[in-house]
């Protein structure tokens, strides 16, 4: 495909677009599946108040509603896009296994490191301000961080692809 495009940057941007569309496609299938199951079972219930109250030991759920759906549905998509594009860039700059190691490290860091800079935290609904009183996570920061990571990864990949011998 690189030979047909004749331009390394066009090939790189094509890979980026394909990567982004793939991630969006996976989420679309997920959301459509959840919707179909919800229709069959009699309604969409993202969080049953009684169950959530029990799990959170009767803590008050802050900002339920729109913010819950934002943290549950929109923020993970942005973070997943950032992780996927960065993995692809690392695979081009270094080697493909390094990209997989980076993804595992990001997700594992989200388990052990509670920080607004740790992308893995934004993939866990329990760490968000909706379900965790006093949470340091912020949806806007997640979008900014994810978008910045995508932009930096695209630029670094574009620069690298021009200089690197990718045929060998």
Residue ranges and their predicted role:
Residues 13-93, 127-147:
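Secretory targeting signals
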Residues 51-67, 98-168:
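Terminal transmembrane helical anchor/hairpin motif
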Residues 9-10, 89-97, 162-166:
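Membrane-interface helix-boundary motifs at transmembrane edges
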Residues 2-8:
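Short helix-to-coil transition segments within interhelical loops
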Residues 8, 19, 107-110:
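Short, solvent-exposed loop/turn segments at secondary-structure junctions
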């Amino acid at each position: 495909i690189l030979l047909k495009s004749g331009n390394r940057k066009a090939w790189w941007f094509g890979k980026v677009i394909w990567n982004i569309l793939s991630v969006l496609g996976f989420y679309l299938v997920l959301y459509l599946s959840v919707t179909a199951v919800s229709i069959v079972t009699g309604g969409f219930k993202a969080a049953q108040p009684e169950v959530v109250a029990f799990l959170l030991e009767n803590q008050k759920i802050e900002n339920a509603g729109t913010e819950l759906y934002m943290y549950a549905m929109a923020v993970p998509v942005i973070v997943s896009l950032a992780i996927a594009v960065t993995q692809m860039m690392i695979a081009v700059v270094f080697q493909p296994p390094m990209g997989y190691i980076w993804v595992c490290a990001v997700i594992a860091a989200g388990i052990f490191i509670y920080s607004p800079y740790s992308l893995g935290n934004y993939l866990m609904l329990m760490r968000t301000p909706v379900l965790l009183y006093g949470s340091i996570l912020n949806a806007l920061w997640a979008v900014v961080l994810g978008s910045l990571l995508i932009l930096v990864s695209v630029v670094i990949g574009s620069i690298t692809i021009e200089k690197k011998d990718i045929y060998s």
